[in-house]
Amino acid sequence: MSELAETTQFLAGREPWSLLPPGEAAAYARRATASYVRRGTQILTAGSPNSRMHVIRSGAVEVRDADGVLIDHDEEGHCFGQSSILEERPSRFTFTATEDTLLWSFEADVVRQL
């Protein structure tokens, strides 16, 4: 299976892409950027501007508020970063990889189209 086909299949099985008409997930998959994040790396920091939504393809990410309180632990299939884009404000949370993590990321204009 090609990387594009794998990305499309993965996205098509998750919201919001699963709500799109058939075939549209592929258009979004073409706009995804893959990145590998090492365990312990902060991906997004509370209070910082954000222009990308991230989808966890593999690995795990912890979510902490600005005071460092653990809010959530996200794994494969979870998205983060979209709320700060849609609300046009800095991130309220810090996202840190708790495992080596593969992310698929989307620019703000793609998020707004969804």
Language-model segments: what does each one mean?
Residues 1-114:
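Cytosolic regulatory regions built on CNB/CRP/Popeye-like sensor folds
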